[in-house]
Amino acid sequence: MQPPYIQERLKSLNDIETQLCSMLQEASQVTFIFGELKRGNESVKPQFENHVKQFYERLDKSTTQLRKEIQLLDENVGTRLLPINVNKKALGQDTEKMEEQLDLLSAILDPSKSK
């Protein structure tokens, strides 16, 4: 089981993620209703304004909370959290895999040019 501090941070990050997903839903609604407004449907203007307002409120709240989490992380590196030393062990494998996938895609799109 994680220490309480880590559990709190994970819960907070989960809440931020939920808010960001909700914000994306609002953005989707804004886009849809904007299309309706462009078609001349003026009756949806109050909904458009409401969704835009909700989008910006959620954006503000989630960025504020994320900034707080980043600040807490900065303050606790070296005290509650150990500094992490990352060593790359699989150098070049990501490039090889990408090239392999691009070759497969090329073969699918144009079989005459396959290697």
From Swiss-Prot:
The keyword Oxidoreductase does not apply. Keywords: Activator, Coiled coil, Nucleus, Transcription, Transcription regulation. It comes from the Eukaryota. Changing residue 92 to S: Impairs interaction with SRB4/MED17. It is found in: Nucleus. InterPro entries: Mediator_Med11. Its main location: nucleus. Changing residue 31 to A: Impairs interaction with RAD3, reducing the interaction of TFIIH with the head module and consequently resulting in a reduction of RNA polymerase II CTD 'Ser-5' phosphorylation. Changing residue 17 to K: Results in a decrease of TFIIK and RNA polymerase II occupancies at active promoters. GO terms for biological process: negative regulation of transcription by RNA polymerase II; positive regulation of transcription by RNA polymerase II; positive regulation of transcription elongation by RNA polymerase II; positive regulation of transcription initiation by RNA polymerase II; RNA polymerase II preinitiation complex assembly. Residues 56-107 form a coiled coil. Pfam families: Med11. Component of the Mediator complex, a coactivator involved in the regulated transcription of nearly all RNA polymerase II-dependent genes. Mediator functions as a bridge to convey information from gene-specific regulatory proteins to the basal RNA polymerase II transcription machinery. The Mediator complex, having a compact conformation in its free form, is recruited to promoters by direct interactions with regulatory proteins and serves for the assembly of a functional pre-initiation complex (PIC) with RNA polymerase II and the general transcription factors. Component of the Mediator complex, which is composed of at least 21 subunits that form three structurally distinct submodules. The Mediator head module contains MED6, MED8, MED11, SRB4/MED17, SRB5/MED18, ROX3/MED19, SRB2/MED20 and SRB6/MED22, the middle module contains MED1, MED4, NUT1/MED5, MED7, CSE2/MED9, NUT2/MED10, SRB7/MED21 and SOH1/MED31, and the tail module contains MED2, PGD1/MED3, RGR1/MED14, GAL11/MED15 and SIN4/MED16. The head and the middle modules interact directly with RNA polymerase II, whereas the elongated tail module interacts with gene-specific regulatory proteins. This is Mediator of RNA polymerase II transcription subunit 11. It comes from Saccharomyces cerevisiae (strain ATCC 204508 / S288c) (Baker's yeast). The gene is MED11.
